[in-house]
Amino acid sequence: MKKLLLILLTICTVALLAACGGSGSQDEDQAANQAQAQQSEQTEEETQMDTKNATLLYLGHGSIRITTAEDKVIYIDPFAGDDDWYGPAADLILSTHDHYDHVVFDKIGNRNDDCQVITRKEALAGGEHQTFDFGYAKVEAVEAGYNKNHNVKECVGYIITLTGGVTVYLSGDTSTTAQMPSLAERNLDYAFFCCDGIYNMDTAEASSCAALVKAKHSIPYHMTDANSGVYFDRSVAEQFEADGRIILEQGEELELQ
């Protein structure tokens, strides 16, 4: 009898130990699964940050605000647009030339301590088109002008290359330039063409320029007389013809990708 009881006690002990061991294994598996889930969630968040796209806000007329993937803020030709649109602190301010409708820097009251301002003077230093690399963006000055209102020696356009390789061409105030055909080799993502037809090229010439530049997307801007107080005219914008055309209303935002 004692022997039988000893056998039963041994069996119960083994069963109990096995049960405890199984529970430990389950706990370990559960902990491993939780760690894996947390790692996957963290990786997903990092991927989302890595794939965050820059945005472009069309302020109207020739004025644009770009917010990079790093949350750096670039203003180009400040003039048109609500004051609220100029609220984000500037990291970089670009001006294509000195006409009043491209240099209202006072609209940008909020600037980071290391904010830089590049006007046509810096962009054309030494009579050469300059390139500036800020890490979050590379800015290349290119030709602009070629009409009686805009001297090619006093005006520039810009090509902005963002991290990730997205490129944005801003014609500035100009007519057709000798450099435009060569820009096709750059395979630009976005190209903005002025088309007011008063001081610069009209929509027909701007459409021809878009055919020369061959950007993935071409966008009309600077389409009215600055003195009119109207800084977007859809009827003019729709006369601009180009492959991959995008029409941005004043105050409309575009994700750059």
Name every feature range the model reports, one short phrase each.
Residues 28-32, 37-88, 123-186, 201, ...:
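Core dinuclear metal-dependent hydrolase active-site scaffold
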Residues 72, 111-116, 214-217, 242-243:
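A short helix->loop->beta-strand "cap" motif at the edges of active sites that frequently abuts
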Residues 21-24:
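Bacterial signal peptide processing site
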Residues 74-75, 80-126, 185-192:
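Active-site metal-binding motif and surrounding structural segment of the metallo-beta-lactamase
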Residues 16-19:
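C-terminal motif of bacterial Sec signal peptides marking the signal peptidase cleavage site
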